[in-house]
């Protein structure tokens, strides 16, 4: 009977280091990666996550915001449009009752506000503090002031 020789895999120091690093790699949850892609405006990755059903657009994340709120907060109209195309709710409220329209008005994004209104966003939706989107507009945001002309603004 032939003798069997046990062969042990030998690793060079470089291979051992690579293997150790691979064992220590960090894996972030899909929702964390998804929100990061939204903040960076990486539409290709945002679309991939949605199409692969790796995330839910309705989830309120630990930040207190849903994906659409994050996109509005980043000021990226194209990302907002992409999320809406895939079913994001333009009426969804964050944990303090803010809608995406509240954020667009507060942060001075007239194009996003106009887009949301064109889809039927509620101009009269009050947040938990009783503020309407128009109450949050800085008077220096002339385009937004004009957009809400005729509604109550202090």
Curated annotation (Swiss-Prot):
In terms of superkingdom, the source organism counts as: Eukaryota
Start and end residues of the ANK repeats are 63-92, 96-125
Cell wall biogenesis/degradation listed as a keyword? no
- Supply the PROSITE patterns for this chain: ANK_REP_REGION, ANK_REPEAT
Q: Which UniProt keywords apply?
A: ANK repeat, Protein phosphatase inhibitor, Repeat
Q: What's one Pfam family the UniProt record gives for this protein?
A: Ank_2
Q: What does this protein do?
A: Inhibits phosphatase activity of protein phosphatase 1 (PP1) complexes.
What does the annotation say about its assembly with partners?
Answer: Interacts with DYSF and PPP1CA.
**The protein's name:** Protein phosphatase 1 regulatory subunit 27
Q: Which organism is it from?
A: Mus musculus
Could you read off the lineage of the organism from its UniProt record? Eukaryota, Metazoa, Chordata, Craniata, Vertebrata
Q: Which gene encodes it?
A: Ppp1r27
């Amino acid at each position: 009977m032939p003798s069997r020789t046990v062969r042990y895999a030998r690793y060079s120091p470089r291979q051992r280091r690579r293997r150790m690093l691979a064992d220590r790699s960090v894996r972030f949850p899909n929702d964390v990666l998804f929100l990061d892609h939204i903040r960076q405006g990486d539409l290709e990755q945002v679309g991939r996550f949605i199409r692969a059903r790796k995330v839910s657009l309705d989830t309120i994340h630990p930040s207190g915001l849903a994906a659409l709120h994050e996109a509005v907060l980043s000021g990226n109209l194209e990302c907002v449009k992409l999320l809406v195309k895939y079913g994001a709710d333009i009426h969804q409220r964050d944990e303090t009752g803010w809608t995406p329209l509240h954020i667009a008005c507060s942060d001075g994004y007239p194009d996003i506000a106009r887009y949301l209104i064109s889809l039927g966003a509620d101009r009269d939706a009050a947040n938990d503090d009783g503020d309407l989107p128009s109450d949050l507009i800085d008077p220096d945001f002339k385009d937004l002031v004009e957009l809400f002309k005729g509604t109550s603004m202090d």
